[in-house]
Amino acid sequence: MASRQGFSNVNEDEPELPPSVLSLKSKFESLSTGDLTNLDEKTAKRRTVKGCKNGTSEPNVFKARPIPPPRQVSSTIGSSTGRKVSGSIQRLASNFKNPSNPHADVSKIDRLPSDSSESHVATPSSPTISNSFVSVSPLLKRPQQKGPEISFQSSVQSTKGNDLMKHDDTNNHQIPPPKPNFSSKAGSSSPISVSPLKNVKAYISQSPTHSEASSVLSSEEEEENVINSSKSVPSFDLHDPFSQTFGKECPISTAPPVLNIGDRSLETPPPIPSPRPPQPVAVEAIQQSRAVISQQLPLHVSPRKPPKPPLRKVSTQRSSSPIENLATKSDASLVTGLQSSPYTHIAPASEMSLIPEKPRLPPRPSHTLSELSSPALTSENLSSKPSPLFPPPPPRVKSLATNKPVSMPVSTEQSDPSVAASSSSSSQLDVVLKGSIPDTSSVRRNPPCFVNGVESINVDFEARIFDVSGDRLVLAGNGGLRVYDTVTGLCHWHMPLGDTKVTSLSFKSSPENYSDDGRFVWFGTRDGMLWEVDVQNHHIVTKKSVSNCPITYVMVYKNEMWTLDDMGKLYVWQEDEIMGLSIQSTPHSIRTIPHATHAMVLDNRLLWVVVGKSIYVYDPSTSENESASVLAKPMTPPGLIGDISCGTTISNFTDLVFYGHVDGKISIFSKTQYRFLELITSSSFYRICSLVGVGNTLWAAYTTGMIYVFDVSESPWRLLKSWHGHKASHNGATTILGIDVNSVWKAKRLQVVSMASSVVKFWDGLMMGDWLATEMRSRFPEYSNFTDVSILICSWNAGASKPSDLDSDTIGASMIPMMIRDNGYPDIVVFGFQELVDLENKRLTARSILSKSSSKGGSSNSANISSQYRLWREKLESEMMRVSSNDDYQVLVCENLVGLFSCVFVKNKLQSKIRMLQSTTVKTGLGGLHGNKGAIVVRFLVDDTSYCIVNCHLAAGQSNKAARNNDLATILDNASLFPENDETDQLNTFVGGGDGSLIMDHEVCVLHGDLNYRINTLRPKALDLIKKNDIKTLLQSDQLLVERKRNAGFRLRTFTEPEITFAPTYKYDVHSEQYDSSEKKRVPAWCDRICYRGSPDYISAENYTRYELKASDHRPVSALIHSKAKMVNAQSQGSTWDVVKRKWIEYADEFKRKAKITYVMNYTSVSYQTAEQYLSGNNWNVQNALKQVSS
């Protein structure tokens, strides 16, 4: 068959042709003005079909369906050059009128004149070519291409339907006929479809040989019904367009094409279509020819509007091969893959079920909660293998001679929370899926700076990566590399790199010479170059192109260097006998997963690579013919968790691998068992940029510029420190952490380096200041004297009540004296009221806002509001005087904000011990502009113990929980208090490394007021539980308790609340014992709360109760706080300080010895005990110990 070609002008030297051919030639020349789309040399060119919009080749009627590419055939018929064509157009037309002519060979005519009503076709008169299609082309002559001829007659005899389209010139309609079924000689049945196009355009596909069958489904056929045909005679289509007379108006069939599948199925996979394009044919002629033939074939009846076809059911055979997976696709992409894919192992059509069936849902996971419970991170649990959630795949056993690891199943599937059968099971499931929350009660906020040496370095070029070794820091990035001294901060060398962009960097291992440790640096670039630089002598050693993509990681493993590029190619560089460890040597390579977001080599010589939140493990010791993957499938953490952004290991926990995530979580995996162990929800929900392990601590840097230090040796984790390490821009701060453990004996300090926005800072990895402060505070009883101080807290939302309302109420008249007597006449009495003025009076609150800006009217408005506070102060003073006959209580401080009022009384004997008294206010209403919501903060010291009392009123509303949380954060962070400048006084009186400028710096904090946290349940259920006095059940829905349990960032998590044993205090009808009966019918809630914070050894609470005062819609509450105030003895403190310093030196020396032992182990591959013996025998001199081991 001749190849389809583009139309062009005929050469002038072309021989004269018969009139019939010249007539066809003129028809084709009229088509040469249309646009042709040239695909390639072997792809057919397609003309723009008339009637399409915007010049596209897709008909309007089929606009919603994609048109498949032309069917490519494996062979072509020679061109018409040299063939004899005789007869006239009229004779050819008469041949088509005769239905008995079985030798009607046709050519394609792409366009017909609109004013012609006759069909101009051509048929060969020679019987020698009756079984071949003839393409008459006006193109230049080309060499004749011979190929197997396709018998049109034999193909027609084996069909059971048609796959043609008739074009009506009058109405310009398309009429899709039924499609034929072609059967091959091999006994296979395969459908061949022709996509219907407007203006009579068809795509013909045929087999390359008579012994092979071609089975290709178009994208349209994938969406249609597939009906199995039987051996019986098919039914007749009453609306068959071919039963109409040419030239008459034919009804348009709206039915989609129907594909008939024979009773025989393919037993062998269909062959891949040949890349050769199909030949052009005269479309209208072939339509008429097939219309005649269709009258001799059994006809098929199809409904005009069939129902929407169901989804195809495909074979569910599982396969790991991408070639076999093509057979499982049920969408239109299967057809494209069969037409264009070079794969040859495609599942045969007989494996594909064509019976419409409703798709089944996947089964639910069958694992239980006990399998998902988080184990404790102990050596006993880590030594035993866990039971997988699902049956593991067969392990991939490697050669026993090489002693390589075996593929391990991974038990990390997500669990279904519905498996929880009880509240305790649900709680355990929350821990597994949502993560446990660290203890933040002892967090310190001061940065761990060094006493001596430089603290930071500002870099004036775009530094992207760094590495540190001893006292040498190397920075690299876009266009340069610099070497700094970490102690002095001086720049020793700057090497310009021009347009070179460094993407990875690491110090080279120096196994052949200990003195070269920290001398040479390897770094990879974006263009795949690997450089070696001598940073001590300031020159380039060598460089080599090892990849055509960026080298993303350069890693060190003992005496080896590992490089990983972006396409997943890992190179392992080992020491050579001639060149040593050099870039110019030949590395061993393996293939890993490309585009790794994190990679690190562990001490068991395995590479852990992360893509997204999937973890892959590779063994580089495998041969090139063997798969390097250790796991049958990657590990992933369970639950809804973000992608992995960083990872690290901790030397004191040899079996644990820690990964940080973009949502602030930290996941833990077992290095030996290849399974997920635990999920930690840190106190920040921002992206973790970097992780570093130091001793028993894990350092985490966040995109906010904050750096957290966790103690992972305890369960739950303890947050030891949090400070603002770097400034964050509007895009965040990408903070990178780095550490050289050997710097503890090389540079005489363990330095953790952080870099963000071209600023490098150095932190004390041992945190000496925090260690000393914590040890000294734990020894307070050794050098301090303690006295008991009791504090009574009374909180009430007065609802704009007046002091006279207390006298009119039965309980109110005796409430304050009864409260003082029942709590044993405490040393300090604090009254905290809310809503002393009507906050719903918009006019009054507006005057209070403008009172400070208006000098004239503001004074009178302020006086009107202040009169309320003055009346309440006088009332409280009179009540306290009535309680104590000898004037025991005096007013310490009285402060007010719009609606808020705090009044503190102390006993006379305690007043002389109080110092550093200060009060301040924090506004949270209207974005901090209005004091209708906010807090009053009172701070004072009793001897050497600091107290802070906070009276607050938070945002109201059942659904405004987030606003209340934000108000708490604003109050605790923005209260402006005077700091303490003396470092000794800071250590003695404040906690967390603070100086007293924040609320959380104080040793005893009490927060009370109308916190407005509600109960998340329905009103009838709440009332029923209150009636039954089932307080514990109702407390399970309390918003404050739920936030403290589940929200890692909740600011009251470090506070303690006494046990609630009374009914909700809100909302009552005024002067009534009935809960809210208004239209809103609010759910009762414990809005009035008292919480405290402090060391359990020095603070406790009791008598947490409510009072039945009906003057407001709230009930007042009170609690008695017991605390111990200390008086530090300076002389005893000095003696204790000397003891603590000696203990610190022992701790630092022990850490230094362990670092040296680990260093010798890595260089010599000896055991821990052997390395310790060599070092102790050489007075812990590393260089002498290495020489002794090598000798």
Curated annotation (Swiss-Prot):
Question: Which residue ranges have biased composition labelled Polar residues?
Answer: 1-10, 72-101, 114-135, 151-161, 181-193, 316-334, 367-382, 400-413
Under the heading SUPFAM superfamilies, the entry gives:
DNase I-like (SSF56219), Quinoprotein alcohol dehydrogenase-like (SSF50998)
Q: Name one GO cellular component term.
A: cell tip
Q: Where is this region: Disordered?
A: 1-193, 205-281, 294-334, 355-425
State the CDD domains in the record.
Answer: UBA_TAP-C_like
Q: Which superkingdom is the protein from?
A: Eukaryota
- Could you list this entry's UniProt keywords, alphabetically sorted: Cytoplasm, Hydrolase, Phosphoprotein
GO terms under biological process: phosphatidylinositol dephosphorylation; phosphatidylinositol metabolic process
Q: Composition bias, kind Basic residues: at what positions?
A: 302-311
| Compartment(s) of residence | Cytoplasm
Q: Supply the InterPro entries for this chain.
A: Endo/exonu/phosph_ase_sf, IP5, IPPc, Quinoprotein_ADH-like_sf, WD40/YVTN_repeat-like_dom_sf
Main localization category: cytoplasm
E.C. number: 3.1.3.-
Where on the chain is Phosphoserine found, per UniProt? 195
The annotated regions of Low complexity compositional bias extend over 414-425
Q: Pro residues: which segments have biased composition?
A: 268-280
The answer to whether the entry has keyword Zinc is no
Query: Recorded GO terms, molecular function?
Result: phosphatidylinositol-4,5-bisphosphate 5-phosphatase activity
List the Gene3D superfamilies.
DNA helicase RuvA subunit, C-terminal domain, Endonuclease/exonuclease/phosphatase, YVTN repeat-like/Quinoprotein amine dehydrogenase
**Top EC class for this record:** hydrolase
Family the UniProt entry places it in: Belongs to the inositol 1,4,5-trisphosphate 5-phosphatase family.
Q: What is this protein called?
A: Probable inositol polyphosphate 5-phosphatase C9G1.10c
Q: Which organism is it from?
A: Schizosaccharomyces pombe (strain 972 / ATCC 24843) (Fission yeast)
Q: Tell me the classification of the organism that encodes this protein.
A: Eukaryota, Fungi, Dikarya, Ascomycota, Taphrinomycotina
